[in-house]
Amino acid sequence: MASIAQAAKSLLLKEFASAFALSMRQFFAPKATLNYPHEKGPVSPRFRGEHALRRYPNGEERCIACKLCEAICPAQAITIEAGPRRNDGTRRTVRYDIDMVKCIYCGFCQEACPVDAIVEGPNFEFATETREELYYDKDKLLANGDHWEREIARNIAMDAPYR
């Protein structure tokens, strides 16, 4: 009896028909592959990419030189030098360097910052040809912040209820 059932299956090509049906379903399904350099997939609002220093809407930098990010960095990739106190009692940084070679993109610096000055932005395309280009100074970080501010502000606003 089993041999008759086996013969019927092979004669009717049931496996072939089911495999062909599966192939046709996949053929007409939407593409799951992206052509990367030309198409980019969605990035989570919590994505931790290239670092940036933010400014207030009036153009003043946010960093108050509290050095919490430098203290919490497990890779010791951040170096900060604070300037003298200003007339209003606040301080600003004279030097703010991040060694991106050491950075492990943990996001602790962003979490520790009381004024949301240092953030990890949405940019993931920052490959370089030399190692020296991965040592970010204050000017580079502020330029990143100016360039990505709209997306950074949107991502922080989306994540605000969970902070």
From Swiss-Prot:
Gene3D superfamilies per the UniProt record, alphabetical: 3.30.70.3270
One cellular-component annotation, GO: plasma membrane
Keywords: 4Fe-4S, Cell inner membrane, Cell membrane, Iron, Iron-sulfur, Membrane, Metal-binding, NAD, Quinone, Repeat, Translocase, Ubiquinone
Chief subcellular location: membrane
Cofactor: how and how many bound: Binds 2 [4Fe-4S] clusters per subunit.
InterPro entries with a match to the protein in the record: 4Fe4S_Fe-S-bd, 4Fe4S_Fe_S_CS, NADH_quinone_OxRdtase_chainI
UniProt membrane topology term: Peripheral membrane protein
The protein, known as: NADH-quinone oxidoreductase subunit I
Phylogenetic placement of the source organism: Bacteria, Pseudomonadati, Pseudomonadota, Alphaproteobacteria, Hyphomicrobiales
